[in-house]
Amino acid sequence: MEDLLNNAKQHLCMRNPKLIRIGLRQVESIVYHVAKPSHDDKIPREIFLKLQDSPLYNSTTPCIYALDSLLEYQQNEEAYEKNFQFIQKLIDDLLHVIEGLVLIHPKSQTLFEDKATLRLFIHLLQPSQPSMLQVAAMKTLVCIMADRPLAIRLFEQINGLQQICVVFKHKQTSQDTRFQILEFFYFYLSPEPYSIDVIAYRKTRTEKQAYLSKYLSNVQGLRDDLDKFQPFGKLDETFD
C-alpha cells in the first residue's frame, strides 16, 4: 500500500491537471475500498489509517497541494478557458475525496488548521465560481471543521464567514448554494466541543451569533430554527 499511496502523491503534486487526475483517481480508489471494505478486500483499513498518521504517506496533504495548483490554473484565463469543464470537474472530485479522507481519518483535519490552506476555500467561495464548486466547498468546510474550534477561529480571522455571507446575499447565487450555506450556518451556530484540547479556541453559541450578526441579519431566527428542528441531532448545551 505504501507504493500505491506514494505513487498517487507524486501525481497529485504535479502542476499538470491531467497528472493530478491520475493521482486523484488512485486515492479515490483507495478511499472507496477503505470506506466500503469487503471480505476479499486487499486494502485493510487499519493499515491505511496507520499510514495516514505518517506525513510521508498521508493523502490529504498532496490533495491540498493539488487544490492549490488547480486554483492557480484557474487564474490563467487562456488555459482555463480551453479546459474549464475539465478543471471544474477535477476540483469538485478533489473536494469530495478530501471529505472522504478527513471522515475516515479525522486526524487529517489538523492539516486545515492553517490560514493559507483555509484561504483556498475563500477562492472557491467567490460569486464568480460555479455553483457546483461553491456547494462542494461548503460541504468540505463542514467536514474539516467538525469538532475543530481552532479551524473555525482561523476561518473567522481570514474573513471566511464574511465571504460566505457575501455569496449568500449575492443576486446571482443559486438556490443550491444558498441551501448549502444555510446548512453551514446551522453547523456554525451549533455548540462546539468542550475539552482541554480546544477550550482555548472555543466560542459559545451566543458569541458566534454575535459574530455572524455583523454580516447577516436575523441570525436569531436561524438559531431558533436550529433549536427547533435540530438537523444534526440533539444539541449539547452543557457548557453554553
From Swiss-Prot:
Pfam families: CDC14. It is found in: Cytoplasm, Cytoskeleton, Microtubule organizing center, Spindle pole body. The keyword Secreted does not apply. The keyword Nucleus does not apply. Keywords: Cell cycle, Cell division, Cytoplasm, Cytoskeleton, Mitosis. Its main location: cytoplasm. Has a role in the septation initiation network (SIN) required for cytokinesis. Interacts with sid1. This is Cell division control protein 14. The gene is cdc14.
